[in-house]
């Protein structure tokens, strides 16, 4: 995949039926809905889906979710330090070259190159903000959505009981 050099404008259509494409963790993971009843997918959700697809395609991704983490790094700082070239730049402290850090990060990680990234870690003097050419806006459903909640009921005994009353 080539280096992204220009701003890219595009639209996408996502077809979702009988699914929760972007649950809200602050609302019991119910679907995100506008006040008018339209479904909403946040820009963060869309970027996560793009990152996951790029990761599946073999691209180096900096912001990996815990459930799709392929390098076993438990934080962004650990991932930055694990990269030999970028980690070496971080360790230079106040002598770090921000331009060199920018070049390394954009070369190494497709999502940094695409969406940008802020590198500001506790204990590091290198603070780096990278702007990417791809910006993502929230998506909304074409029609209002109906939210139905289904409760699961148990119809069998999981253990034997000593006495049954019929």
Question: How would you describe each model-predicted region?
Answer:
Residues 1-166:
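RNA-binding basic/glycine-rich loop and surface signature characteristic of RAMP-family CRISPR effectors
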């Amino acid at each position: 995949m080539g280096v992204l050099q220009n701003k890219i404008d595009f639209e996408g259509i996502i077809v979702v039926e009988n699914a929760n494409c972007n649950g809200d963790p602050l609302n019991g993971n119910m679907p995100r809905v506008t006040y008018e009843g339209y479904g909403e997918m946040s820009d963060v959700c869309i970027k996560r889906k793009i990152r996951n697809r790029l990761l599946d395609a073999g691209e180096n991704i900096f912001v990996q979710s815990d459930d799709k983490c392929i390098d076993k790094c438990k934080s962004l700082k650990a991932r930055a330090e694990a990269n030999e070239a970028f980690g070496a730049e971080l360790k230079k402290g106040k002598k770090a070259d921000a331009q060199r850090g920018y070049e390394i990060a954009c070369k190494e990680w497709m999502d940094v190159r695409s969406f940008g990234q802020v590198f500001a870690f506790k204990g590091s003097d290198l603070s780096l903000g990278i702007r990417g050419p791809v910006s993502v806006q929230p998506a909304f459903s074409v029609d209002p959505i109906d939210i139905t909640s289904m409760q699961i009921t148990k119809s069998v005994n999981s253990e034997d009981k000593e006495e049954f009353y019929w």
